[in-house]
Amino acid sequence: MPVFVVSYDLTRPGQQYEQLLNTLEHELQGRRVLFSQWAVRSKGDARALLAHLRPSLIDASDRLLVMDRDSLDWAGINLVSRLEKIEP
């Protein structure tokens, strides 16, 4: 099963992380890497995991990035910069 790196920003002050954290930690048995970054094993691809996590976000301004650790396949919502524009 691939390992995904999940990074998020809940952008409004005072937002509660409980639903997202519960999904990441308990349902997906992920491990926190940084304050807002987790490592998660999941079947499927980055888009499938993003679709699974999306209901845990609080509002439309939240940001979420899911990236396969090995293949670098990724999916995101409201990213600050577009990954396609980053030169190797």
Give the role of each language-model region:
Residues 20-25, 59, 76-80:
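Short, structured coil/loop segments at alpha-helix boundaries
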Residues 48-52, 75-88:
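Short, low-order "capping/linker" segments at domain edges
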Residues 23, 68-69, 83-84:
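Short, charged/polar low-complexity linear motifs in solvent-exposed/disordered segments
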Residues 26-73:
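Short, intrinsically disordered low-complexity segments
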Residues 14-15, 73-75:
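Short, surface-exposed beta-strand/loop "edge" segments at domain boundaries and coil↔beta transitions
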Residues 1-33, 37-40, 44:
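Extended, hydrophobic alpha-helical segments
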